[in-house]
Design a protein with these regions (language model features):
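Conserved small/polar residues in nucleotide/adenosyl-binding loops
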Residues: 105-114
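Short, charge-rich, low-complexity alpha-helical interaction segments
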Residues: 4-47
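Short, charge-rich amphipathic alpha-helical segments embedded
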Residues: 78-100
Length: 114
């Protein structure tokens, strides 16, 4: 697999459909860097409550289908990454009420022991 290319100047690149500079990478790599897709998808990305996650995932999947009709591989892959990232975060909220995997109170108590 070709790794995601972090050396590109993402602040100044506006990717186009099927842009040859785009690399899939592994999992969620580069999900917040690839503009304009990140900006377009991110405004619909919610996961804190069950209802938010359902609405968000349906909207992003609809965007995926729109990109598919346009044969826009970059848009499709970015939607996939956001859905994957949302699934991971939603699972975290399901397992931890505040979404944190570490109790900061516990860490502070532990730090004072040293």
């Amino acid at each position: 697999m070709i790794e995601f290319d972090y050396s590109l100047d993402y602040k100044n690149i506006q990717f186009k459909p099927n842009d040859k500079r785009y690399r899939i990478g592994r999992g969620e790599q580069g999900v917040l860097l690839v503009r304009p897709y990140t900006n377009d998808i991110c405004k619909h990305w919610r996961f804190k409550t069950h209802n938010e996650a359902v609405i968000s995932s349906q909207k992003i999947f609809d965007m995926y289908l729109e990109y598919r009709i346009k044969k826009d591989f970059v848009g499709m892959d970015m939607c996939r990454k956001f859905l994957e990232m949302g699934f991971t975060r939603a699972r975290r909220y399901a397992n931890h009420k505040d979404g944190r995997t570490v109790s900061y109170t516990h860490l502070r108590a532990h730090e004072t022991q040293f």
